[in-house]
Each structure stands twice: as C-alpha cells, then as structure tokens.
C-alpha cells in the first residue's frame, strides 16, 4: 500500500499546476477600497447589533413608583414605608411640602445640597 501511495504522490508532483491555481495579480485600487468599505460597514453593523442586544436596560422594579392620590412620587427600592429623619432637618417653614436649599460656604465656593 505504501508503494502505491508513493507512486501516486510522485505522479501528482510531476504534473504541472492547474490554471486555476495560478494567481491573477492584485485587484484594482478602487476594488480594494470598495471591499474595505463593505467589510467596515459589516463590522459596524455587527457591533451595533451586539451593543443593542448586550446592553439592553433591565426593566425597572414594580415598586419604583408609588401613587398617592393623583400624584406619583418616586421612592427608592427597599425603603417602602420607612421615614427618613434627615428630611425633617431641612423642611421649609413656609410650606409643609417644600424643602430649604441651605447654602454652605466652602472657601470661595458656595455649594448647596441639591
């Protein structure tokens, strides 16, 4: 069997190459540019598709908005029914539902909590 393989291999090596195996040369410059632009656009489309499916925002939790009467107030998740005592320290004396924006001096910069 090895002798037959050796004879077939030597015959294949002795034959001239087929015409389809010889190179035709370089492509024209405009064709190279067209191929480069097409490949670039395909890669950008793939990147947009991956970004769209990979980076989708997760749906918000159900208890994110609490409705009081006809007004919706945003609440933090996990703080449902809890009162923050920090809010009482900067309530406005003019209106019960308003807060004071107390300025704090830090050198030459005037900053406020909001």
From Swiss-Prot:
Location relative to the cell: Apical cell membrane
Residue spans, topological domain Extracellular: 1-28
Sites of Phosphoserine modification: 85
Entry superkingdom: Eukaryota
Principal subcellular localisation of the protein: membrane
Membrane-protein topology: Single-pass membrane protein
Database matches in InterPro entries: PDZK1IP1/SMIM24 (IPR031627)
CC per GO annotation: apical plasma membrane
UniProt keywords, alphabetically: Cell membrane, Membrane, Phosphoprotein, Transmembrane, Transmembrane helix
Residue ranges that the UniProt entry lists as topological domain Cytoplasmic: 52-114
Chain segments annotated as transmembrane: 29-51
UniProt family annotation: Belongs to the PDZK1-interacting protein 1/SMIM24 family.
Function: Auxiliary protein of electrogenic Na(+)-coupled sugar symporter SLC5A2/SGLT2 and SLC5A1/SGLT1. Essential for the transporter activity of SLC5A2/SGLT2 but not SLC5A1/SGLT1.
Subunit structure: Forms a heterodimer (via N-terminal transmembrane helix) with SLC5A2/SGLT2 (via TM13); this interaction enhances SLC5A2 transporter activity. Interacts with PDZK1.
Name of the protein in question: PDZK1-interacting protein 1
This protein's encoding gene: PDZK1IP1
């Amino acid at each position: 069997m090895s002798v037959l393989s050796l004879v077939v291999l030597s015959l294949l090596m002795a034959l001239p190459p087929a015409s389809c195996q010889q190179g035709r040369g370089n492509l024209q410059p405009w064709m190279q540019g067209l191929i480069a632009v097409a490949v670039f656009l395909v890669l950008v489309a793939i990147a947009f598709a991956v970004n769209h499916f990979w980076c989708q925002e997760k749906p918000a939790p159900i208890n994110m908005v609490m409705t009081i009467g006809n007004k919706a107030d945003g609440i933090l998740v996990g703080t449902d029914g809890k009162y923050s005592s920090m809010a009482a320290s900067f309530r406005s004396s003019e209106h019960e539902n308003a807060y004071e924006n107390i300025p704090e001096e830090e050198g030459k910069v005037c900053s406020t909590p909001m």
